[in-house]
Structure formats: structure tokens, C-alpha cells
């Protein structure tokens, strides 16, 4: 009887006090989430693009190449080499800001469950925040007042140009975040055996 009580105590202790999650586990979850969001962004963009005529696609692509995304003002590495030289904290901070910048605009996206996208972005933002806190080494992450929203003028309109820009920018930014989180994970997890 004492063995049963002891076993139940140990089992309940394991449920009540689970082992803390490691950075490696958090990074794996974050990379998995952003990979999912990047796939959703790609699918949504290509679905929208394929609904357009070939001429409309060509015109919108030409216009988009001249325009820039509202998130372009977030300073980020410009190429693979600069990304690899960036600190883990810098990559996490940029990723956090990019994810945060899409929490509101993601509600206007078409081609997917917008609530699901917004929820995944919020979960990812929290996960990145936890990773930043675990890796900050006493440095201030950034002030709480740094929150911002991208200024997409006419969210939810039926204007193909605006929707094209919104989807293209979402796809571009999710690709950036996926790259930055993958590089940071590889740098902190030698067992990940990553080639960048």
C-alpha cells in the first residue's frame, strides 16, 4: 500500500511540476510555428496570384518590385552573411518585431483562417519573448513602448493591388522570421547539426 501511495505521489508531482522547457525545445516549437505560418503565407499568396489574369499578375509584380513593405523600416540583415554574423539576441529581436508588426494586419489576409493566423502569430510572439528573456544576458530587450502596428491603409478592401502587396509582404516577412529563428536555433543548439 505504501508503494502505491509513493507511486501516486511521484506521478502527481510529475504532473504538477513538469520539467522546465529547454531553449532547444522552445526554439524547435518556434521554428515549427514559423514554418507553418510561412507555408500559409506562401499558399495564400500563390492562391491569390493564380486567381488573377496573367497580365494582372505581371503588372502587380512589377508594381510590387518598385514598392516596399511597411516592415522594411525594421532594420534587419541584408544578406546571408550578415544574418550569420548577427547575434542570437539581434535575430530574436528582429523576429519579435516582425511578428508583432503582423498581429493586426494578419486579420485582413485572405486565403486562410485569419483567426488561426492571428493566434499563431500571438503564440509565436510569446515564444520569441521567452527565448529573448532566456538569452538576454542582463541586457534590456527593448522598451515595452516599442510596440507598433504596420500602417496598411485600407485593410480588408477588395483592391487586388493592396491585397497582393499585403500577401507578398506577409510572405516575405514570414520567410525572414523563419530564416532568423533557424539560424539562432542552429547557433544555440550544436546537436541540431545545421548547415546554413
Swiss-Prot record:
The entry's keywords: Disulfide bond, Hormone, Metal-binding, Pyrrolidone carboxylic acid, Secreted, Signal, Zinc
Main location: secreted
GO CC annotations, alphabetized: extracellular space
Residue ranges of the TM segments: none
Record's protein name: Somatotropin
Gene (name only): gh
GO molecular-function terms, A-Z: growth hormone activity; growth hormone receptor binding; metal ion binding
Lineage: Eukaryota, Metazoa, Chordata, Craniata, Vertebrata
Signal sequence region: 1-18
Pfam family, one: Hormone_1
Amino acid at each position: 500500500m505504501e508503494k502505491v501511495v509513493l507511486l501516486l505521489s511521484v506521478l502527481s508531482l510529475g504532473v504538477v511540476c513538469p520539467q522546465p522547457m529547454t531553449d532547444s525545445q522552445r526554439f524547435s516549437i518556434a521554428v515549427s510555428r514559423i514554418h507553418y505560418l510561412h507555408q500559409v503565407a506562401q499558399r495564400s499568396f500563390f492562391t491569390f496570384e493564380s486567381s488573377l489574369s496573367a497580365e494582372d499578375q505581371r503588372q502587380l509584380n512589377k508594381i510590387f518590385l518598385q514598392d516596399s513593405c511597411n516592415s522594411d523600416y525594421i532594420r534587419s540583415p541584408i544578406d546571408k552573411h550578415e544574418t550569420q554574423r548577427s547575434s542570437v539576441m539581434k535575430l530574436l529581436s528582429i523576429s519579435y518585431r516582425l511578428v508583432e508588426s503582423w498581429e493586426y494586419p494578419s486579420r485582413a489576409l485572405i486565403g486562410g483562417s485569419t483567426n488561426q493566423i492571428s493566434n499563431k502569430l500571438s503564440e509565436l510572439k510569446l515564444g520569441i519573448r521567452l527565448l529573448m528573456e532566456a538569452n538576454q544576458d542582463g541586457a534590456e530587450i527593448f522598451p515595452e513602448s516599442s510596440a507598433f502596428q504596420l500602417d496598411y491603409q485600407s485593410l480588408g478592401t477588395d483592391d487586388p493591388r493592396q491585397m497582393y502587396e499585403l500577401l507578398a509582404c506577409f510572405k516575405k516577412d514570414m520567410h525572414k522570421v523563419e530564416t532568423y529563428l533557424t539560424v539562432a536555433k542552429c547557433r544555440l543548439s550544436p546537436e541540431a547539426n545545421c548547415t546554413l
